[in-house]
């Protein structure tokens, strides 16, 4: 029997998820169909219910529905509860189970695919939105010496840090980053989506081994261009994170984790 899954978001025409999951299914021998649903902001719960009624067994969830997906769940993982957002749902009988694989997907891309272990490093996370919330637990568990958040809205970042309450997690204003250096700098702001640069001092890159842009398919964004100008040897966008979180969802649904490297290689565009 063919199993049915989909991604739901708005807009959804840009999504790579059907391609990714079809490649996963082909390489693992799983019999499934995977589609895309343009969700309704006014009736997300109805969209989910209709998909379930048609035999759907799980959903990947993208913007702007991750909070609604979390609220819809009857049971949520610790990662989803911390992020207050779900990027994957699984349906078991009457239960709606919620997970958030964004952070673990990002961590796996950085450590495994890009060869940059977080243990013993100073990490700078730009932003304090859902992507950062989802990354904090996996990142802190990886053993950095310090994890610093910087955000335009300093209060939002401070409240998040207080909520986490971890001794290795701290908050800076962008201005307070002047004179500081980091081993890894990650841009999780929305600035690159509109071709802008977060107001980060150029000096944060001078000792960095990797600059990572969560947006993908945007080429050499202003953030990555500044990092390259400051001598950062390794630049990456978020396509690896996209594929790795998809693999985590696939494994949660199907019980088998697909190989990700061939899919990442197929989807990666040059950073030019």
PLM region spans:
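Short glycine-rich anion-binding loops that position phosphate/pyrophosphate groups of nucleotides
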Residues: 62-70, 129-131, 190-193, 217
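Helix N-cap at the beta1-alpha1 junction of Rossmann-like dinucleotide-binding domains, i.e.
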Residues: 12-13, 154-155, 218
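Glycine-rich adenosine-cofactor-binding loop
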Residues: 9, 100-103, 110, 114, ...
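Mobile, glycine- and charge-enriched loop segments
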Residues: 22, 26-27, 31-37, 107-125, ...
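Phosphate/diphosphate ligand-binding glycine-rich loop within oxidoreductases
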Residues: 2-114
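NAD(P)-binding Rossmann-fold cofactor-contacting core
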Residues: 144-164
């Amino acid at each position: 029997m063919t199993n049915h899954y989909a991604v739901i978001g708005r807009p959804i025409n840009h999504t790579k998820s059907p391609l990714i999951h079809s490649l996963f299914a082909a390489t693992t021998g799983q019999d499934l169909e995977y589609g895309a649903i343009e969700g309704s902001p006014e009736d997300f719960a109805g969209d989910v219910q209709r998909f379930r009624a048609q035999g759907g067994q799980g959903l990947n969830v993208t913007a702007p529905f991750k909070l609604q997906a979390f609220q819809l769940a009857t049971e949520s993982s610790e990662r989803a509860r911390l992020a207050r957002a779900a990027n994957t749902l699984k349906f078991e009988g009457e239960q709606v189970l919620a997970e958030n694989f964004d952070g673990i997907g990002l961590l796996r891309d950085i450590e495994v695919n890009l060869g940059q272990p977080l243990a013993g490093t100073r990490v700078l996370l730009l932003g304090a939105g859902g992507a950062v919330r989802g990354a904090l637990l996996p990142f802190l568990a990886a053993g950095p010496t310090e994890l610093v958040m910087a955000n335009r809205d300093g209060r939002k970042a401070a409240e998040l840090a207080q909520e986490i309450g971890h001794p290795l997690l701290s908050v800076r204003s962008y201005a307070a980053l002047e004179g500081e250096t980091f081993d890894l700098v990650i841009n999780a702001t929305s600035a690159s989506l509109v071709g802008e640069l977060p107001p980060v001092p150029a000096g944060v890159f001078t000792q960095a081994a990797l600059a990572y842009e969560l947006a993908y398919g945007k080429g050499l964004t202003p953030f990555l261009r500044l990092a390259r100008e400051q001598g950062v040897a390794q630049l990456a966008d978020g396509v690896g994170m996209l594929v790795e979180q998809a693999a985590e969802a696939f494994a949660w649904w199907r019980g088998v984790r697909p190989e990700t490297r061939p899919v990442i290689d197929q989807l990666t565009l040059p950073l030019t």
